[in-house]
A protein has these predicted regions:
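Active-site rim elements
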Residues: 64-69, 181-187, 206-208
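Non-heme Fe(II)-dependent double-stranded beta-helix
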Residues: 1-15, 21-122, 233-234, 240
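Non-heme Fe(II)/2-oxoglutarate
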Residues: 43-49, 53, 157, 193-198, ...
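Double-stranded beta-helix
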Residues: 137-203, 228, 240
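Short, solvent-exposed loop/turn segments at secondary-structure junctions
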Residues: 26-27, 95-100, 112, 137-139, ...
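Short, conserved beta-strand element in jelly-roll/cupin
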Residues: 117-139, 190-193, 198, 222-226
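Short Gly/aromatic-enriched secondary-structure transition segments
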Residues: 34-37, 146-148, 213
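Generic beta-strand structural signal
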Residues: 86-93, 103, 126-132, 142, ...
Length: 241
């Protein structure tokens, strides 16, 4: 990656709340990650799938030691370093897969520290998601959709869904809830297998329904890109988790 390309990606991350790196997961690691993920998904209980109907699945990467290889993959560190984060701290990770015929993912943001002033003033992400896509992903099978810039500015969806992480929204108790609706400003983020999408945890995002008969799988890994720069209260809270 050239310095100009890296700078462009960083500016997009700061401005829009996300950026994309194409074809950065090598074919062998992609294949093995898909195999392990499929095994875990095949073993998932029907109860789990019903509870996570909107998300699809939410399986911790701690369920299989293989994922240590993906977490430590040079491609992840290199992408974060290119964005100006040479010393990130890993937090958690999940296998998130929308089965064929599953509904949209609800609109939400994933940051929790809104009682800290820096949550509103920081230009760079305090927490970032790294989404590794294992299959080609389009609007037909559940690609990511985002509301650009909502990591730094308010949107009506913040009021519509002040607390999106509820059991009712995950299970799609009310399919007509505003959390699932398309938004005029939404931007689709279609990707190819092996692509990496990096985003700010404060960004409002969701995913389209999977209208195909095949599962759509992404491995979402969470990092603190600039751990040493976080405020003491936030680091203290995270150290307890």
């Amino acid at each position: 990656m050239t310095s100009a390309t890296a700078n462009e990606a960083r500016q997009q991350l700061l401005r829009d709340g996300f950026c994309r790196f194409e074809q950065v997961l090598d074919a062998d690691l992609l294949k093995r990650t898909r195999q392990v993920s499929d095994r875990l998904l095949d073993a998932a209980s029907q109860e789990h799938l019903e509870e996570q109907k909107s998300t699809g699945s939410l399986i911790s990467v701690l369920e299989d030691p293989f994922f240590a290889e993906l977490i430590a993959a040079p491609a992840a560190r290199e992408a974060l370093a290119a964005l100006g984060f040479p010393d990130p701290k890993y937090a958690a990770g999940f296998v998130i897969s929308k089965p064929g015929g599953s509904p949209p993912l609800f609109w939400h943001q994933d940051w929790w520290g809104w009682d800290e002033e820096c949550s509103y003033t920081w230009a760079q992400p305090m927490q970032a998601f790294l989404m590794w896509y294992l299959v080609d992903t389009t609007t037909e099978n559940g690609c990511l959709r985002v509301l650009k810039g909502t990591h730094r500015k308010r949107h009506s969806m913040h009021d519509e869904v002040p607390d999106a992480h509820t059991a009712e929204l995950r299970a799609v108790v009310d399919p007509d809830h505003p959390a699932y609706r398309a938004q005029p400003e939404e931007v689709d983020v279609p990707v190819n297998a092996g692509d990496l999408v990096i985003g700010d945890s404060r960004l409002l995002h969701s995913a389209h329904a999977n209208k195909t008969d095949q599962r759509r799988t992404v491995i979402t890994l969470w990092y603190y890109p600039a751990w040493d720069e976080l405020s003491e209260p936030i680091r203290a809270r995270l150290s307890k988790d």
